[in-house]
Every structure is written in C-alpha cells, then in structure tokens.
C-alpha cells in the first residue's frame, strides 16, 4: 500500500519499469522467467473535495464525467510523440490558479507536480502595481502583455479609453511587461526547483512544451528557456 493524505484521492498510476529478480529497466516482463517481480510506480493524486466539486459542476450542465485526467497528461497525449517521451519532455500547463507540470523520460512519467500560482496571480500583480481593477488588469495582460522585457514594443505606453474612472489613464508598457516577466520567472523557477532536487532536470531532452491560457503570451517561451 502507498500512503497519501487522507484528504486526497488517486488519479493515475504509471508503471515506469519492472524489476525481474533484481534486473533493472525491464519495460515488459511478459514471457520472462523469474521468481520475483517488482515495479517502479509514479502516482498522481489530488485533493478529493476539489475533484468532487469539478465533477459536480460538470454534472450541473448537465453532462456526465467519464474520467478525470491530470491536465498536463491530457496535453501530453496530443503534443508529444513517442520519441519525444522517450528522449525526455517537460509539459508545463499554466492555468489561472495553478501551474501543473509533468516530466516524461524513457517513455513514461518520472515526475509531476501542481503549484498554487498561475495567470490569476499575474492579474493580481498588475492590479496592485498599476492600481487598476482586476478585470482591467486581465485585459491589459491579454491585449498588451509580453513576457520578454528585452524585446522592444512598437509603443512605449497606451492610453485607456472607455473605462469608468480610468478613461485617459496612461499605462507604461515597459512596466506592464516587467510585472509579467517577474511573476513568470518565479513560476518557472518553482517548476525548476523540484526537478533539480530530484536530479531530473537533465532528463529534459526533447524540450519544454507550454500549454494553458498563458502559453499564448508573446515571449513566454524565451522566459522558460532563460530559467
């Protein structure tokens, strides 16, 4: 048995490889001779109440839930080829409230995680620094945001229009880009830290693959490469 917090529920069980009588790295033991069979597993679990709430929301549509899949695993099935999974690939899904990641190596999952930081935190940063409401901060990020501060913009600033109390307000785009850049640096470093601790960072052979709403932000790939 594997111990996980009582508040959590199992989502996925991935067999990385088998051991036959102590022989390591066996991918398929069928047909082999031996007296002892062991396996190296990677388990993914989540907070039970959050999973239950997600199911309840879908059923209220009304629709039925066939299964629950960890977001970057679902993305990996579309984005990654078998060769890329074998060579090593890191999928990072930056959502609103969380950043989820999964690392493939030798065709199977070797590490995964969920961080409590995402695009909504960037909106909050913009709102606090520029002193604008959250809905306007989101619009600024989507319409004028850029992750790479070194790449020059065609404009140095913009003037807000059609915004109650903020009509005519000038926004410094360099400052906006700096806010986004700093939070993204934090997010990618938070992903990097556990990979370094487990000694898995050098297993990213075929590259880093970004998904989620934040992946559309211009220059985000360069920030990921910088980290």
Where are these regions (language model features)?
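Feature representing long, continuous alpha-helical segments
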Residues: 124, 174, 178, 182-189, ...
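Nucleotide/phosphate-binding catalytic cleft detector across ATP-hydrolyzing
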Residues: 1-90, 108, 133-135, 139, ...
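Residue-level signature of catalytic and energy-coupling elements of molecular machines
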Residues: 58, 93, 126, 191, ...
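Glycine-rich phosphate-binding loops at beta-strand->alpha-helix junctions
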Residues: 146-148, 203-226
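Short beta-alpha connecting loops at secondary-structure transitions
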Residues: 110-111, 124, 172-176, 206
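A conserved active-site cap/scaffold subdomain adjacent to cofactor or substrate pockets
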Residues: 116-138
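Phosphate/pyrophosphate-binding loops at sites that engage ATP/ADP/AMP, CoA/4′-phosphopantetheine
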Residues: 188, 192-206
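Gly/Thr-rich phosphate-binding beta-strand-loop-beta motif of the actin/hexokinase/Hsp70
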Residues: 80-111, 126
